[in-house]
Amino acid sequence: MASPLRSLMLLLAVLAVAWAGTSRPPPRLLGAPQEADASEEGVQRALDFAVSEYNKGSNDAYHSRAIQVVRARKQLVAGINYYLDVEMGRTTCTKSQTNLTNCPFHDQPHLMRKALCSFQIYSVPWKGTHTLTKSSCKNA
C-alpha cells in the first residue's frame, strides 16, 4: 500500500516541477514600451510626422517615404512615445511636390536609395502635438 502512495507522490512532485518550469509571458511593466500595430491610427500619425521631419532635414532633391514599418512600439508617459523602425525609400517626387501618397519609388539603380531609420516621436494627442525626439538612419 505504501508503494502506490509513494509512486503517486513522486508523480505529483514531477508534475509540479514540470508545471512550474513551463514558460509564461513575463508580466507587463506599467509604463514600459509595448509592441504596437503599424496600422494603428496613432502609429500612422507618428510615422507621417517622422517622415515629414526626415524630408525637411534631408538635403536630397527628392522626397522619401516609408517602404515598411519594421517594428513599432509605444510607451505611455505624460503623452505617448512611439518607437518606430522604418525602411525608407527615395521617391520620384521632388521637394517642390507636396503630395507623397502616390509618389512611386525610384527604380533606376543610380537613383534608388534606401535607408533603415529609427525614429522616436513624442505625441500628446489631446494637445495635437508631435515632437521628433530622436532620429537615426543608415543606408540599407
Curated annotation (Swiss-Prot):
Residues 1-20 form the signal peptide. InterPro entries: Cystatin_dom, Cystatin_sf, Prot_inh_cystat_CS. It holds the Pfam family Cystatin. A motif (Secondary area of contact) lies at residues 75-79. One of its GO terms (cellular component) is cytoplasm. GO terms for biological process: cellular response to hydrogen peroxide; cellular response to oxidative stress; defense response; embryo implantation; eye development; male gonad development; negative regulation of blood vessel remodeling; negative regulation of collagen catabolic process. GO terms for molecular function: amyloid-beta binding; cysteine-type endopeptidase inhibitor activity; endopeptidase inhibitor activity; identical protein binding; peptidase inhibitor activity; protease binding. SMART domains: CY (SM00043). CDD domains: CY. The record marks 31 as: Reactive site. Belongs to the cystatin family. This is Cystatin-C. It comes from Rattus norvegicus. The lineage of its organism: Eukaryota, Metazoa, Chordata, Craniata, Vertebrata.
